[in-house]
């Protein structure tokens, strides 16, 4: 730690009694709460993680599969940050059988891909991280649908793409942040029978 003095100007005191400053970068994320949700795409399919196949895809699932919840019932870990923002930093994890997997983004063959790695989501994240996404409402008139922007690359969103008869979870670059792209639309629900 340095003894150097840094002059800062307070900007505002928000309702959570956190003091925010101008021109300071976010230097850490601290886990605030965790909520459990299913993810659906615009086709009402559930997101299912299959680590043994190294794939996460939206699928039509049977009632029996849904009851087990294995690979489908996600923990959304909400983080606090030191920067005031309308975007909520989140990370994702899911239980498959008796193991926990967290979502991360990695570069493979020059392309960013979504992966699920065995392990737990950290309580505190110092600095940047390949597991953080920013949760945003999909459109102003669609408060129950969301899109998730990758924290390390602006304009890169979670989406789905048809590949070998699967709707795989991918990262997709949008030319404009306000572009309405249905492949980046996700509905979260605590009930597997939720309809779009």
Swiss-Prot record:
Q: What is its main location?
A: cytoplasm
Propeptide residues, chain positions: 1-29
Q: Which Pfam families match?
A: IL1
> Which chain positions lie within coiled-coil regions?
none
Its GO biological process terms? CD4-positive, alpha-beta T cell activation; cellular response to lipopolysaccharide; cytokine-mediated signaling pathway; defense response to Gram-positive bacterium; establishment of skin barrier; immune response; inflammatory response; interleukin-18-mediated signaling pathway
Gene3D superfamilies associated with the record: 2.80.10.50
Q: Which compartment or compartments is the protein found in?
A: Cytoplasm; Secreted
Q: Give a yes or no for keyword Flavoprotein in this entry.
A: no
Function per UniProt:
Augments natural killer cell activity in spleen cells and stimulates interferon gamma production in T-helper type I cells. Involved in transduction of inflammation downstream of pyroptosis: its mature form is specifically released in the extracellular milieu by passing through the gasdermin-D (GSDMD) pore.
Tell me which family the UniProt entry assigns to this protein.
Answer: Belongs to the IL-1 family.
Protein's UniProt name: Interleukin-18
Q: Which organism is it from?
A: Gallus gallus
Gene (UniProt): IL18
């Amino acid at each position: 730690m340095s003894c150097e003095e840094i002059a800062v100007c307070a900007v505002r005191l928000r309702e959570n009694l956190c003091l925010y400053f101008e021109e300071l970068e976010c230097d850490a994320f601290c886990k605030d709460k965790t909520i459990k949700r299913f993810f659906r795409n615009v086709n009402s399919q559930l997101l299912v993680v299959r680590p043994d196949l190294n794939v996460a895809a939206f699928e039509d699932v049977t009632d029996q599969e849904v009851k087990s919840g294995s690979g489908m019932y996600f923990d959304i870990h909400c983080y606090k940050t030191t920067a005031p923002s309308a975007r909520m930093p989140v990370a994702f994890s899911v239980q498959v059988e008796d193991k926990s997997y967290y979502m991360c983004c990695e570069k493979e063959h020059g392309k960013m891909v979504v992966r699920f790695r065995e392990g737990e989501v950290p309580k505190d994240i110092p600095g940047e991280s390949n597991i953080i996404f920013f949760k945003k409402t999909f459109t102003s008139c669609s408060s129950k649908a969301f899109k998730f922007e990758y924290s390390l690359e602006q304009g890169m969103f979670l989406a789905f793409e048809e590949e070998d008869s699967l709707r795989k979870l991918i990262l997709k670059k949008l030319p404009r942040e306000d572009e309405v792209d249905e492949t980046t639309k996700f509905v979260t629900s605590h009930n597997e029978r939720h309809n779009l």
